[in-house]
Amino acid sequence: MFGFISDLLTAAVSSLDELLQDTPAHQIILGTAALYFLYNQYHNPSISRWCRSRNNASMKQRIIDSAYALAKNLPGVNQIIEKELNKELSSTREKLRIQRSGMTLREEIPEEGLSPQDILSAFDVDVEKCHFDFLSVTNDSPEREFLVGRGDGKDSGALYAIHPKELTELLKEVYGATALTNPLHDKWPRINAMQAEVIRWCQNLFHGSKEGYGLLTHGGTTSIIEAMAAYVIRARAKGIDYPEIVVPETAHAAFKKAAELTGAILITVPVDKKTGAVNPNVMSSYITRNTAVMVGSAPSFMNGIHDPISELGQLAKKKNVPFHVDACLGGFLTAFLDTSSEPMDFRVPGVTSISADLHKYGCCPKGTSVCLFSEDSPALSVYAALNWSGGLYATPGILDGSTSGARVAEVYATLSYYGKNKYQEIAKSIIRLRNAIQKELTALVEEGNGLTSEDIYVYGNPQWSILGFRSNTCNAHFIADELEKRGWKLNLLQNPDGFHLCLTHVHTLVGSFETQFIKDLREAVIDVKNYPPGKKPSGNVKVYGAVGMMPVELQKEICKQYQKARLDFTAASHGSLGIFAPSSTEEDDGLRNRKVGEQKVQTSL
C-alpha cells in the first residue's frame, strides 16, 4: 500500500517537473507564494481576519500604500514628499491666515476680568442687531429674528434651524439657571428627572418601550461610539477576541472611529451601485461568528438614501446579531413623517439601538444627540468601577463622566417649545422643497437647452432631505467649485466623485430657493462643460484629487497637521507642516488601542 502511494507521488512530481521545466524560476516562486497566500486567506484565521479588515481599501489604495511603505525608507524621499505636501496645503494655511488676520488673538487668559461688552466683541457679533441675511424672505415669520450667526441660505446642512427670538431668550435664561448643575449627582433631582423625560420622549418618538434605555450625548459621533463600544465589550465578554462591526460602505466615518477606539475590526459591505443601499443578502455573507453588531443607515450622510431596515432587521434576527440603526442625520425628520409603510425604528423586529441627533432636525443647541437601546438589547452603554479606591463609580454611558445639566435643560426647553405639530410642519416643508428641486432639475434636463441627465443628475432615489449630485460627462467636483464661486457651500463626496445639498428648515424660509439653486446649478454645469482640455483643479477640488493619490498614512498625517493649525493661530500663518518631524507620541491613543486588539494578527504576518 505504502509502495503504491510512493510510486504515485514520484510520478506526480516527475509530471510537475516536466510541466514546469521551461518556466522561469521567478514565476514559479511568485506562483507558489500566491497559492500559499490564497490558501491562508481562507484557512488561516489570522490572515483571514487581516484580509477582512482591509476590505474597505480599494486595490488602487492598497498599491499606493504598499509602494509608499517600500519607498519611505529610501534616502531623501521623506524630505521630497514633505516639500510637495507643504506646497499643496499652502493655500489652506493662507486661507486660515486671512480669516484670522483681523482678529485680536490672545496667548493667555486675561490677568483681569473683561467686561461683558468686551467679551462679546470677540465673537464678531453685533449684539444690538444681528439678523440672518437671506437671499430673499417672502414671509414675516418670527424666525427672522435670529441672534446667533449670519448666512445667506446657501450653506448645505450647516444651520438646521432659525430660532425665534423668544426661544433664544428662553435658552439664555435656561443656561444661566443650569450651567453649573451636574446630572451625575443627585443634588439636582429636577435635572435628573428632565433627562429621564427627554429619553422617554425620544423612545416614544422612535416607537420604543418604557423599558428601553437611552443616553443624551454630545453628538452623533459620540452616540455611535457609545453603541458600538457596548456591543464590542459584550462580544469580548462572550470570548470573541476579534469583534467585527459590519457596516455598509456608505455608513458614517464615525463607525471607523468607533472601531479604532474599541480595537474592533470594521467590515464594510458594498452597496448596490444603482440604488445606493446595501443588499441584505450581500450583508449576510459578511456576518460571521465574530460579528459584534451590524449597522444600517436611515438615511446615509452621503446621498440621503436609507438602507432596507426591515429586511436588515430580519437578517439580524436570523443571525442572532445586534442591529444598530444610524439615524443621526435624519432621525428627527423621519420621526415626524409617515413611515408606517417602511418603518426604520424600533417597530422593526431586530433593531436593538438607534442613534439620532437632536441638534439637526430636532432644532436643539449644537452638541446634543441621543443613543437609544431597545428593551431586549443584549448590551447597554453603561460603565461601572465598583472596586475603585475612591468609592463606587458608575456612569450612564461609557465615555462621559460629569456633564453640565444645561445640555439636558436646553434640550428639554427646545423640544417643549416646538412641540410635535411644529416639527411635523418643518419636516413636511423640507420634503416639499426637496420635491420642488427635483422637479425643477427634471424640467431643466428635458428642456433641450444643452444639458441632459448625463450632465447632472440626482443619484439613487432619495426620499428625505439630501440630494446627491453626480455627472457622467463632467468632473462633479468642478461643478461644486463653480457653485462655490456663486456663494454655495456644498459637501464634496468621493468614491465616486459627487456633491450633496442637505436641506434644512433654513432653506424652506428662502423665497424661490429651488429656482435660484437650479439656475446656479445650470450655469455651473455649462461653465464646466466649456472648460479647456487639461483644466487643472484648484481649491478643494485640488485637495480631494491629491488626497486620493496619497497613502493612508499621509492622509491621516495631513488631517492631523491641519487640525493642529486650526487650534494654533500661529501655525496657520507661517512655518512648514513638519510632517516627518520626530514626535514624543508616535501614534494616536485610538490607534494604539486598536493595535492591542490586532496584535496577534500583525505578529502572525
Curated annotation (Swiss-Prot):
GO CC annotations, alphabetized: membrane
Region annotation Disordered: where it falls in the sequence: 580-605
Domain of life (superkingdom): Bacteria
Keyword Glycoprotein: no
Record field: catalytic activity: sphinganine 1-phosphate = hexadecanal + phosphoethanolamine
EC number: 4.1.2.27
Modified residues (N6-(pyridoxal phosphate)lysine): K360
Single GO BP term: sphingolipid catabolic process
Gene3D superfamilies registered for this protein in UniProt: Aspartate Aminotransferase, domain 1 (3.90.1150.10), Type I PLP-dependent aspartate aminotransferase-like (Major domain) (3.40.640.10)
Cofactor(s) the protein needs: pyridoxal 5'-phosphate
UniProt keyword annotations, A-Z: Lyase, Pyridoxal phosphate
Molecular functions (GO terms): carboxy-lyase activity; pyridoxal phosphate binding; sphinganine-1-phosphate aldolase activity
Sequence similarity: Belongs to the group II decarboxylase family. Sphingosine-1-phosphate lyase subfamily.
PANTHER family in alphabetical order: PTHR42735, SPHINGOSINE-1-PHOSPHATE LYASE 1
Role: Cleaves phosphorylated sphingoid bases (PSBs), such as sphingosine-1-phosphate, into fatty aldehydes and phosphoethanolamine. Possibly implicated in influencing the macrophage autophagy pathway.
Protein name according to UniProt: Probable sphingosine-1-phosphate lyase
